[in-house]
From Swiss-Prot:
Pfam families: APH_6_hur (PF04655). Coiled coil: none annotated. It comes from the Bacteria. This is Streptomycin 6-kinase.
Length: 307
């Protein structure tokens, strides 16, 4: 099968790259078939199915010469991609997908193949699913961050500098007060940002069924920081479902209790850094033109307040 047949670029991925990176993104998309062909040859891989795409990457299932099933993951080289390679090399497969090889020039990763058809969201019992996620996260954040990884202290400091402009952009006085409250929580913690290696995006959809372990994490965007900053994606998992069940406060508090217990976190610090994630998300939304806080973020913050 020709490379051009294997590498069918999904239109949403091409459009996303054109929108985010302009001509650079379009050129990267156009060069993908040739890059895949080069890497298949260099690493002696055989394509084992059609390509698929994530939010920012193209994934191609392959076989190594010894029959090992793997995937090529290709995405535009950037800081987050380099951080992911650093994190995966440091974790070395402990609780996370294993990095088998990588190409420094293109930032392409050769990863062990997991079962992309079965995420942790398939586990209906929320306590069971959150227990799995908490166990994986505890393993990941037990590892000290290597030198050179982007740090939460710098990220949080930059966030605080943006707050006055962001507050002015909000239409509702209640939203302004809440954004300032989140910023105050971060300001109290920014002097001790932590030194653990964080995943940054560990939710149910980023945990896949595997062979060497029942479940493994995927798609890290590592940074050095306090594990409390890593809780929000887990708390937000299956959000529409828990809203539909009209049980948001109980589920959020139950998840928070489980996560902080398994990770051994100080609850006040964990809540403060979770407000930091809500602040980060809000700043991005406001930068994109929003004049109101996300109702889901407001609801989650209310569930944590006083708990």
């Amino acid at each position: 099968m020709s490379t051009s047949k294997l590498v069918e670029i999904p239109e949403p991925l091409a459009a996303s790259y054109a929108r985010a990176f302009g001509e650079e993104g379009q050129a990267w998309i156009a060069a993908l078939p040739a890059l895949v062909e080069e890497l298949l040859d260099r690493w002696e891989l055989t394509a084992d199915g059609a390509s698929a795409s994530g939010e920012a990457s193209l994934v191609l299932p392959v076989l190594r010469t010894d029959g090992t099933r793997a995937v090529l993951k290709l995405q535009l080289p950037r800081e987050e991609t380099s951080a992911a390679i650093t994190g995966l090399r440091t974790w070395n497969g402990h609780g996370v997908v294993r990095l088998l090889d990588h190409d420094p020039r293109s930032s392409t990763m050769l990863l062990e193949r997991l079962d992309a058809s079965r995420t942790l969201a398939s586990v209906e019992d929320d306590d069971a699913a959150m227990g799995v996620l908490a166990g994986l996260l505890a393993r990941l954040v037990s590892v000290p961050a290597p030198r050179g990884l982007r740090g939460l202290g710098d990220i949080a400091g930059a966030m605080l500098e943006e707050v006055p402009r962001a507050v002015a952009a909000l239409a509702d006085p209640a939203d302004r007060r809440l954004l300032n409250d989140w910023a105050s929580a971060v300001a109290e913690l920014v002097g001790e940002p932590g030194d653990r290696m964080l995943h940054w995006d560990l939710h149910y959809g980023n945990v896949l069924a595997a062979e060497r372990e029942p479940w493994l994490a995927i798609d890290p965007e590592p940074l050095a920081g306090d594990p409390g900053f890593d809780l929000w994606p887990a708390l937000d998992s299956r959000w529409d479902d828990i809203v539909a069940q009209r049980d948001v406060v109980r589920v959020v508090r139950r998840r928070f209790d489980l996560l902080t217990e398994v990770l051994g976190l100080d609850r006040a610090r964990a809540a403060g850094w979770t407000y930091g994630r809500l602040l980060q998300n809000a700043l991005w939304d406001i930068e994109d033109g929003s004049a109101a806080l996300d109702p889901a973020a407001v609801t989650l913050a209310q569930a944590l307040r006083g708990h």
